[in-house]
Amino acid sequence: MHIEITNICNLKCTFCPPKLKPTSTMSLEHFDDINFQLKDFTKELAYHVVGDPLVLSNLEKYLDISLKHDLKVNITTTANNINQSHHNILMHDAIRQINFSINSYNANSHKKTFDEYINPIIEFVKYAQEQNHEYFINFRIWNLDETLSAKEFNKKVFEKINVEFNTNIDVNEVYENRPKNIRIAKKFFFHFDEYFNWPSLDNDIVSKTGTCYGLDSHFGILSNGEVVPCCLDQNAEVDLGNTNTSQIKDILNSTRVKNIQNGFKNNILHEELCQKCEYRKRFD
């Protein structure tokens, strides 16, 4: 279950589409109400559609609310602004997993050097290890294409990790074997994937048939309360309703939601955005 507590991010990654929605952050009161409702649907939240939770100075209060409702949390962040003030917050009991989008550095024009970016992240990981963290830490390298720039960047990342964590990761072996993940230390992994194109109504139709995990394994709630069928509908092109005016159970019982779900079960894509989504082809 993806809940976007803010759509604010302090980077403009080339792999993210332009944000069309106004800047917004979900209020703590509304977030509390959504967590209360979501207990009937999930045990786990991902604080992400777009936006970076670490930009919020009161992130701990959101985590407190999820913990109160016995919900575990996945955090995805570029960690561009991570510093020691985040260390204790990111040891919160609600957290199940932290994903660091490491290849975000290579997808931006930075004033920071690579070491200025990566060193504070490594500092946090070592702090978490000293605290015997029980959650998973993933370094996402989602750029395993064949471009030289990405491969050279990845080589630099691996060399840094090899030195800091006594590993022996070879960039050529990674590109040759294409592993899904590599263990760095206890509950600390590299996670690999390739770039993908975000779905857009401006795209060409990919297919009118197929299936998806949207509205099955997950759905999304944007920071303004709009409910969407999946974690890639950042602009609510498929606006299923709004949690500011409707209960989640009523939104999920709507005719439109049922039509989408039944379509996926019968290999039919009813929504235009789904027909224009390349990522969905992974599930065919």
Where are these regions (language model features)?
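Short cysteine clusters
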Residues: C9, C13-C16, C212, C230-C231, ...
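C-terminal accessory region of radical SAM enzymes
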Residues: F124, A128-F136, N166-S207, L232-R282
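Conserved alpha-helical substructure of the radical SAM core
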Residues: M1-I98, S109-N119
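Conserved strand-turn element in the central/C-terminal portion of the radical SAM core barrel
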Residues: A107, K126-V157
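Short, acidic, Ser/Thr-enriched surface-loop or helix-capping motifs
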Residues: I221-L222
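Structural recognition of alpha->loop->beta junctions
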Residues: N35-K39, H86-A107, K155-I184
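Short loop/turn microsegments at loop-to-beta-strand junctions
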Residues: L215-S217
